[in-house]
Amino acid sequence: MAIIKYKPTTNGRRNMTSSDFAEITKKKPEKTLLESQSHTAGRNSYGHITVRHRGGGHKQKYRIIDFKRNKDDVKAVVKAIEYDPNRTANIALLHYTDGIKAYILAPKGLKVGAVVESGPDADIKPGNALPLSAIPAGTEIHNIELKPGKGGQLVRSAGTVAQVLGNDGKYTLVRLQSGEVRKILSTCRATIGSVGNEQHSLIQLGKAGRSRWLGKRPQSRGSVMNPNDHPHGGGEGKAPVGRPQPMTPWGKKSRGIKTRNSKARSEKLIIRHRKGNK
């Protein structure tokens, strides 16, 4: 993947960049692996806004991704690398030897024609899925399960990667993208390699319209609101916050406050917290 920079022919193009989509080999998705999805614009079943700044955006079909990778000892050939509008990573279309088709997250370096498989005896190469107990220390992994058989939940965004540090009996030590080191059950599965499309974070939208295509609505600063709408609102002209520290719209401190529950049961599985929480 390479980043395309545009000539400043308009104000919207001046700082715009995009992907060249060189890795994409197929434009139309596999129809049997599509589902319709409706968007709620950040509203719940009562019609109340529960997530602000959501709404609009282009219609999208959901691609059914195989996060479980539990089809053991059946080899599959990579038939295409496709774009997925629902995630930052690209996806790979697999054709299994028994006729089944499936989508997986496309790891970095996976090419059309490559053969991938799952199971404890699979080779250590990008795209193969194994239990953590069968993955040697130092191996880069992604799409990591937290509960055996539930499907990958960790390290699924474009360019992310985790590393196996070693096996400790029932658990395997894994260093995540954030720097956190935690124990994960050795029977949980993970996929070898890092997630592809690693330059996605370098893309600049360049104009407000591209945010609207993605379903993101404008966000107003609290300081330009009325005092009944935000703790920062009110005052004459450009008034300061007027409080010891910035607040959320609901009156809670917004900086330096830990949001993780210190009594969570998974706390005992974390060996070292992420870099921001030293």
From Swiss-Prot:
Biological role stated in the UniProt entry: One of the primary rRNA binding proteins. Required for association of the 30S and 50S subunits to form the 70S ribosome, for tRNA binding and peptide bond formation. It has been suggested to have peptidyltransferase activity; this is somewhat controversial. Makes several contacts with the 16S rRNA in the 70S ribosome.
Ranges annotated as biased composition (Basic residues): 210-219, 252-263
GO biological process: cytoplasmic translation
Keyword Disulfide bond found: no
Quaternary state and interactors: Part of the 50S ribosomal subunit. Forms a bridge to the 30S subunit in the 70S ribosome.
Transmembrane domains' residue ranges: none
Pfam families: Ribosomal_L2 (PF00181), Ribosomal_L2_C (PF03947)
Gene label: rplB
GO MF: rRNA binding; structural constituent of ribosome; transferase activity
Protein's UniProt keywords contain Zinc: no
Chain positions covered by the region annotation Disordered: 210-278
Family the UniProt entry places it in: Belongs to the universal ribosomal protein uL2 family.
Designated name of the protein: Large ribosomal subunit protein uL2
Annotated GO CC locations: large ribosomal subunit
Record's keyword terms, sorted: Ribonucleoprotein, Ribosomal protein, RNA-binding, rRNA-binding
Origin species: Lactobacillus johnsonii (strain CNCM I-12250 / La1 / NCC 533)
SUPFAM superfamilies for this protein: Nucleic acid-binding proteins (SSF50249), Translation proteins SH3-like domain (SSF50104)
